[in-house]
């Protein structure tokens, strides 16, 4: 518990900044985009064959609805969430090596397993807090922009996807962190991984290649599919949970066995 509290306290600044940034952005932008895109369906003929919609996985008819506008904005929030999740996972591991505190931490009366679990729990708590603020701000924005004219389940699934994608990249970040503990530029690495993953997803949609889509977590939260079916795609959720479990177990095993190395 001591390690958990310490790690969560260390993440306090990040939690405040990300919660405020995501919540404020979606709250103020959503009503504007709902109004702006409400007439998009009337101009559908002008956008026929536009490859942009294929790349982002939506269409004009969906965009013209309040929930469609929210889905469109969620695409960009997912990218931000992926960067934050990856950065959290990387940072919570690599900071011990960068700050040369590994020898001190690992010689305290705590097992490595407890240290890892405490770090993971603190990072997951941070993601949940950020996700909760985003959810509430999204709900307030939807109420303000659509006058309550939307399906709450669909909205909840779209909003929850921001938390889930952060969880996915958090576990991936921790795995990368235990393998390459001396990474200094965590933000750059996180942004790069998030962007490459998005490119895989965009390429998958454009080419209609399902296999490539499995390499992009963004595909797992396809807004158009969620809006039409009011659910996530089952196989993607199974894959997501499986990968997160594999990343976590592998990272835990490496962390517990890795030699203590102090950064020079």
Specify the residue positions occupied by each region the protein language model found.
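Hydrophobic/aromatic residues in alpha-helical transmembrane segments
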Residues: 85-89, 137, 171-172, 217, ...
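Long, hydrophobic alpha-helical segments
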Residues: 68-94, 191
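Transmembrane helix boundary and interhelical loop/hinge segments in multi-pass membrane proteins
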Residues: 86-106, 120
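Terminal transmembrane helical anchor/hairpin motif
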Residues: 3, 11, 28-67, 179, ...
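Transmembrane helix-loop junction
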Residues: 6, 95, 139-143, 177-178, ...
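Aromatic- and glycine-rich beta-strand/loop motifs that create alpha-glucan
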Residues: 1-22
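Secretory targeting signals
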Residues: 23, 27-31, 67-73, 117-169, ...
């Amino acid at each position: 518990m001591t390690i958990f509290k310490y790690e969560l306290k260390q993440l306090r600044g990040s939690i405040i900044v990300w919660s405020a940034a995501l919540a404020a952005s979606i709250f103020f932008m959503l009503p504007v985009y709902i109004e702006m895109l409400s007439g998009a369906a009337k101009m559908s003929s002008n956008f026929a064959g536009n490859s942009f919609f294929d790349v982002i996985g939506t269409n004009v008819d969906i965009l013209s609805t309040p929930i469609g506008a929210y889905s469109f904005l969620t695409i960009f929030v997912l990218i931000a969430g992926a960067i934050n999740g990856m950065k959290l996972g990387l940072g919570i591991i690599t900071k011990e090596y960068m700050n040369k505190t590994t020898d001190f931490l690992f010689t305290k009366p705590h097992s490595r397993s407890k240290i890892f679990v405490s770090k993971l729990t603190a990072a997951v708590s941070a993601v949940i807090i950020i996700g909760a603020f985003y959810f509430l701000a999204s709900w307030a924005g939807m109420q303000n922009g659509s006058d309550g004219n939307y399906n709450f389940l669909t909205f909840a699934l779209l909003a929850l996807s921001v938390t889930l994608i952060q969880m996915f990249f958090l576990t991936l970040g921790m795995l990368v962190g235990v393998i390459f503990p001396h990474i200094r530029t965590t933000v750059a690495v996180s942004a790069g991984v998030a962007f490459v993953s998005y490119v895989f997803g965009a390429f998958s949609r454009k080419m209609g290649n399902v296999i490539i889509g499995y390499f992009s977590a963004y595909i797992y939260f396809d807004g158009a599919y969620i809006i039409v079916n009011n659910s996530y795609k089952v196989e993607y959720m199974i894959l997501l949970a499986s990968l997160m479990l594999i990343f976590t177990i592998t990272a835990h095993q490496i962390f517990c066995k890795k030699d203590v190395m102090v950064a020079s």
